[in-house]
Amino acid sequence: MKKIIVFSDIHLNSATDETLENSSQKLEEAIAHLQSNHNDFDTLVFTGDLANSGKTDEYKALRNLVSTIDKPIKFMLGNHDNRENFLDIFPDYRPDHNGFLQSNESYEYFDFIFLDTLKDPYDDIPISCGYLCQKRLEWLAGKLKEAANKKVILFMHHPAFTTGMQAMDRLRLKNSHDFFSSIKSFDNVHHLISGHIHRNISGLYEGYNFSTFKSVNQQMVLKFKADS
């Protein structure tokens, strides 16, 4: 069994923002804690919103902060990220043949699949929502087919499920119906892991186990009713 560590929504920022002014320090402390207490981990997964504004300087700061980690890292993108700027600073991260930052890792009994839910400029959805276009869904279907005899854990920034927090549920994966229609064609999806919500939540949705994780940077207020 692999030991996977998840860091979610680190929101490194290069601008002055009182709520994020210690973002680099918080990530540095999280990495130090990881290396002191869980250094037997196999992979560190960042579930998106690596940067707060998607600026090159923010990704440079991230590159410097993770330079002390000598084990595999999987970076994923969220709605605060910029795909082009990220790839400029992390050129070793190759997008798939459609230009999206999607990948998979195959093990004896499990496969991990990492999805790119960052909207493209031509996706006609609200700016903070997630989206999986037909190309991304077809890529996912291909990977699920390859892993037919294994359990699959899907990682994605935007949750496809609802949490009861109305304001955040409005900003989830916009075409979650298409997503669930796609994965229900297979019987090997074991767990859905997401970021975006900035809280630890787990449950069952559409028959699938799911988990979200709190932000390394700042937590979301547990508020179920959205402001009108």
Functional labels for PLM-detected ranges:
Residues 13-17, 84, 121-126, 162-166, ...:
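A short acidic, helix-capping loop that chelates divalent metal ions and anchors anionic groups
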Residues 50-52, 79-83, 119, 160, ...:
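Solvent-exposed loop/turn segments at secondary-structure junctions
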